[in-house]
A protein has these predicted regions:
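Intrinsically disordered, low-complexity, charge-rich terminal extensions
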Residues: 1-172
Length: 172
């Protein structure tokens, strides 16, 4: 039985996405704008935080380096990138206006392992009992909207051979 052909492609795209996201965060302050918008309210920022894992090689020759530290320059991870490794897992921060989300993303499955939403307003007596839950769902939906928009931007670059070749040269 052969594995699904897309398995390797999914892993590759996930690693390329996180590596590209790190690069974008370093070179453009991680600034993104919703597609088709010129409104300043539609700007958001995405950065990889001080905890990530880089992986390179295949099978028995697979090497992984995990790096974390507050305000760390991530030198080991940078050395891994220059050796051809790619980001495999990362803590990603999304900021839009006053709101701040954090998620841990696994590149192999593009699975969100953890999601921290912005703080919710305090529930006061007389408030709708469902308000707290609905606000939390709204914040989760906003996180997914930001993630989807970021991934869409990546795919626009990745699916253009000319744009992707230029981006890879810049990343290396």
């Amino acid at each position: 039985m052969t594995s699904y052909l897309g398995d390797n492609l999914d892993i590759l795209l996930g690693r390329e996405f996180l590596t590209w996201l790190w690069y974008r965060g370093e070179t453009s302050s991680g600034m993104f704008r919703f597609s088709g918008s010129k409104n300043d309210d539609d700007v958001f920022f995405v950065t990889l935080e001080q905890r990530l894992t880089v992986t390179g090689g295949e099978g028995d020759h697979k090497e992984t380096a995990s790096v974390s530290g507050s305000f760390s320059p991530l030198l080991e991870a940078r050395a891994g990138l220059s050796a051809g490794k790619q980001v495999n897992r990362a803590l990603i921060r999304f900021v839009r206006g006053e709101l701040d989300w954090q998620m841990t993303l696994n590149a192999e499955s593009l699975r969100i392992n953890a999601l921290k939403t912005p703080p919710q307003s305090k529930q006061e007596e007389g408030d709708d009992p469902d308000a707290f839950f609905l606000e939390k769902m709204y914040l989760i939906e906003q996180a997914m909207t930001l993630f989807n928009e970021t991934y869409k931007k990546f795919l626009n670059v990745r699916l253009s051979p000319k744009d992707w070749a230029a981006e890879v040269r810049n990343i290396q």
